[in-house]
């Protein structure tokens, strides 16, 4: 947490909603078990920290409850600090309902972990065996964050996982004098009734395979496992972007998107590829990158059947079929299918050549052009013809060479119908029809239609 967040936490004005990061189901499927455990541990740690320091929601609710009781002439009660914030609880419940959480398939191992944890429990309070999953998760979380005081926070959140969000109203309680008196818990009863009415409103919602209710978006019909996830989704329809970047002022609909964006300013790249060591700002980018090592290509074009390792690459490829060119140059009006191609094109206008050859000092506007050029120095010829075994430094030259074997002549003159195997051959031929002579001799001023003719002519002056 930042220093500003720490200060706000001390003042009791931070809620779990302010710091919670919620994944969509698509994003969640991209995480492996270790990453899911780390995410869960961080969320549980934040929840425990905020509830132990005093949630902003609880502060508002307690003030309202004290005011209500005072207006009715009732004595104020001291709310135990261990009470959980009822507004933040559903958010954590949504997180714990995500499928495939570590620990869901380890009930036997969970019991043994609970037993081990009980042996070291300084409070001496036994953990209930019917909370195997939650106990196991907290045990693992404690391993990930050794500084977290598990003994202090575990009972609170265990009660949360047993759905003790709205405690049953007690009819009687013992007074300090030892007498029994009727408890006036009307404020809590009203809250319980409110929760009950919300459940009735959602009774028509569809259910998951295990019987849990889903929350359905009234705009598009999409369903979600938790109300908080639904609230986040609905910002797609409303356009609401409540999270602002303090560095550039850009707004985002989710805190997770803001956190990803902030790394642009900080330069942080916390996700490292175990194969090649490359670093990424987002976990989804790392997952996409790792497919280059595994060879997985799950995204297939419905038009031509070509497969890609990344969804973004498929989206770019589809523009070949649709002809869409959404990126326009403000200087000359030319349009491009990809933003990267537009950025390369702009260097024609600016003259910027950021890629320099270390061997000869020649500069290039594109990195790919530099790589091709460097093969002049290294002699590398990675592209080999399967027909004759001849090798080439560039794939485009290999494609042109293959036409010798296939006899393909894809470039046809619109004037006379003559065909050529290379585009350069067609361009040279078209000069015959236009009469253009762009190649001029510096010595005598004679002009020629082809560069080769000029070179042959210049030998007359050099003789």
Curated annotation (Swiss-Prot):
Residues 174-191 have a biased composition (Basic and acidic residues). It is found in: Nucleus. GO terms for biological process: regulation of DNA-templated transcription. InterPro entries: KRAB, KRAB_dom_sf, Znf_C2H2_sf, Znf_C2H2_type. Gene3D superfamilies: 6.10.140.140, Classic Zinc Finger. The keyword Repressor applies. Its main location: nucleus. One of its GO terms (molecular function) is DNA binding. Signal peptide: none annotated. Residues 106-128, 171-211 are annotated as: Disordered. Keywords: DNA-binding, Metal-binding, Nucleus, Repeat, Repressor, Transcription, Transcription regulation, Zinc, Zinc-finger. Residues 14-89 form the KRAB domain. The keyword Protein biosynthesis does not apply. May be a transcriptional repressor. Interacts with HNRPK. Belongs to the krueppel C2H2-type zinc-finger protein family. This is Zinc finger protein interacting with ribonucleoprotein K. It comes from Mus musculus (Mouse).
């Amino acid at each position: 947490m930042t220093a500003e967040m720490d200060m706000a936490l001390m003042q009791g004005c931070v809620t779990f909603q302010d710091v919670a990061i919620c994944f969509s189901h698509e994003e969640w499927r991209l995480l492996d078990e270790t990453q899911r455990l780390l995410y869960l541990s961080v969320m549980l740690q934040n929840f425990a920290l905020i509830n132990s320091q005093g949630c902003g929601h609880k502060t508002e609710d307690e003030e309202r409850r004290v005011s209500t009781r005072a207006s009715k002439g009732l004595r104020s009660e001291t709310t135990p600090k261990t009470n959980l914030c009822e507004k933040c609880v559903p958010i954590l419940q949504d997180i714990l309902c995500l499928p495939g959480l570590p620990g869901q398939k380890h009930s036997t191992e969970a019991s043994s972990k609970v037993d081990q944890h009980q042996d070291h429990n300084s409070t001496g309070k036994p953990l209930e065996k019917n909370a195997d999953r939650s106990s196991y998760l907290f045990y693992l979380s404690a391993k990930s964050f050794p500084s977290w005081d598990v003994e202090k926070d575990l009972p609170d959140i265990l009660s949360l996982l047993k759905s003790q969000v709205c405690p049953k109203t007690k009819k009687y309680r013992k007074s300090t004098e030892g007498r029994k008196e009727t408890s006036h818990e009307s404020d809590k009863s009203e809250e319980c009734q409110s929760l009950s009415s919300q459940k009735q409103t959602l009774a028509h919602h569809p259910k998951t395979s295990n019987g849990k209710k889903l929350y359905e978006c009234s705009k598009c019909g999409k369903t979600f496992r938790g109300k908080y996830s639904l609230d986040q989704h609905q910002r797609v329809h409303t356009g609401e972007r409540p999270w602002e970047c303090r560095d550039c002022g850009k707004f985002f609909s989710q805190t997770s998107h803001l956190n990803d964006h902030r790394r642009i300013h900080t330069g942080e790249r916390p996700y490292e590829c175990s194969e090649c060591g490359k670093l990424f700002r987002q976990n989804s980018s790392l997952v996409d990158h790792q497919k280059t090592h595994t060879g997985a290509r799950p995204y297939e074009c419905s038009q031509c059947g070509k497969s890609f390792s990344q969804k973004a690459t498929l989206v770019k490829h589809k523009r070949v079929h649709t002809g869409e060119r959404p990126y326009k140059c403000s200087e000359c009006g030319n349009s491009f299918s990809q933003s990267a191609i537009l950025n390369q094109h702009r260097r024609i206008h600016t003259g910027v050549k950021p890629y320099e050859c270390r061997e000869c000092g020649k500069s290039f506007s594109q990195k790919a052009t530099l790589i091709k050029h460097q093969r002049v120095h290294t002699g590398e010829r990675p592209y080999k013809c399967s027909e004759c075994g001849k090798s080439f430094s560039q794939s485009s030259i290999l494609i042109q060479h293959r036409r010798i074997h296939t006899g393909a002549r894809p470039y046809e003159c619109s004037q006379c119908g003559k065909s050529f195997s290379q585009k350069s051959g067609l361009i040279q031929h078209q000069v015959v029809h236009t009469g253009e002579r762009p190649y001029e001799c510096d010595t005598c001023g004679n002009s020629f239609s082809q560069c080769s003719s000029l070179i042959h002519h210049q030998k007359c002056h050099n003789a």
